[in-house]
């Protein structure tokens, strides 16, 4: 029985299946953890969702910002952008079934035995684990309810960007969503910066990657996350695992086998078109 953690798939179905074959993943015996952003940019979002859903209890995933955006498009709140390549999924006969399943997935995964926590963007240093659990449940409850379109309509925005237990209503839900799915940099006090996307070396002072600011969760748990492809899986402290290595941008899809901490990679089927900054099929 092995536990495999894989970074952002982004619709790269062929690479996902090739990587799972490489590690000899066996549903029913092994467990697959996915860092979110299952969909968008790659050509196979529909196949990815169908496959992941079919795994049942053999998969543990978290929602990413692109997954939430897909739900907003499905609900008629956001525009379907051609570059996201979501039309085959949105027009599929089982779209309702797939997307209603997707919106009932969590923002946070925890394995107490492994001392392992996973969230798409990471865990803000302003939270302890109990707060993270409560915050995840708040958003998950709304997403799984009939009123989820109202939340999706209000989730876009960068404020508030500082945690307080006194936050209420949509502002609270927006902060939680941003912390779990969009966070990269923080100010030294843990306040979120929602604008900088460059590498840590190029970020303006006093910003730091969230994982460079001491927080109570990282003191006791390993943290696995995706979202930040430009890290290329590097530069994190011990016990912090960056797994998004930019498959949809022409990089690789990365898998970490938890038991022996061995990495496996599957090269993207796409290459970078530097003139456009987009990855194209090779």
From Swiss-Prot:
Any one GO MF annotation of this record: bis(5'-nucleosyl)-tetraphosphatase (symmetrical) activity
Statement: the UniProt record of this protein carries the keyword Hydrolase: yes
EC number: 3.6.1.41
The keyword Hydrolase appears for this protein: yes
Domain of life: Bacteria
Annotated keywords: Hydrolase
InterPro entries given in the database record: ApaH (IPR004617), Calcineurin-like_PHP_ApaH (IPR004843), Metallo-depent_PP-like (IPR029052)
Catalyzed reaction equations: P(1),P(4)-bis(5'-adenosyl) tetraphosphate + H2O = 2 ADP + 2 H(+)
PANTHER family: CYTOCHROME C5, PTHR40942
Family statement: Belongs to the Ap4A hydrolase family.
Function: Hydrolyzes diadenosine 5',5'''-P1,P4-tetraphosphate to yield ADP.
Protein name in UniProt: Bis(5'-nucleosyl)-tetraphosphatase, symmetrical
């Amino acid at each position: 029985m092995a536990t495999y953690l894989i970074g952002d798939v982004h619709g790269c179905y062929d690479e996902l299946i090739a990587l799972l074959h490489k590690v000899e993943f066996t549903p029913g015996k092994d467990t697959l953890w996915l860092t979110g952003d299952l969909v968008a940019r790659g050509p196979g979002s529909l196949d990815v969702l169908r496959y992941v859903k079919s795994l049942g209890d053999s998969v543990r995933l978290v929602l990413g910002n692109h997954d939430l955006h897909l739900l907003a498009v499905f609900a008629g709140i956001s525009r379907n952008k051609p570059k996201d390549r979501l039309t085959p999924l949105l027009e599929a006969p089982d779209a309702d079934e797939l997307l209603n399943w997707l919106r009932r997935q969590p923002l946070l995964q925890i394995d107490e035995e492994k001392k392992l926590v996973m969230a798409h963007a990471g865990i803000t240093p302003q939270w302890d684990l109990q707060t993270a659990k409560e915050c995840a449940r708040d958003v998950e409850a709304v997403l799984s309810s009939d009123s989820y379109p109202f939340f999706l309509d209000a989730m876009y925005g960068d404020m508030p960007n500082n945690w307080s237990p006194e936050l209420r209503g949509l502002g609270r839900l927006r902060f939680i969503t941003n912390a779990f799915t969009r966070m990269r940099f923080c100010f030294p006090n843990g306040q979120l910066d929602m604008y900088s996307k460059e590498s840590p070396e190029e970020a303006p002072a006093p910003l730091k990657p969230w994982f460079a600011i001491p927080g109570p969760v990282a003191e006791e748990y390993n943290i696995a996350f995706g979202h930040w492809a430009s890290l290329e899986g590097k530069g994190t402290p011990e016990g912090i695992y960056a797994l998004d290595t930019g498959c949809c941008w022409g990089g690789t899809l990365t898998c970490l086998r938890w038991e022996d901490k061995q990495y496996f990679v599957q090269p993207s089927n796409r290459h970078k078109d530097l003139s456009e900054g987009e990855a194209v099929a090779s």
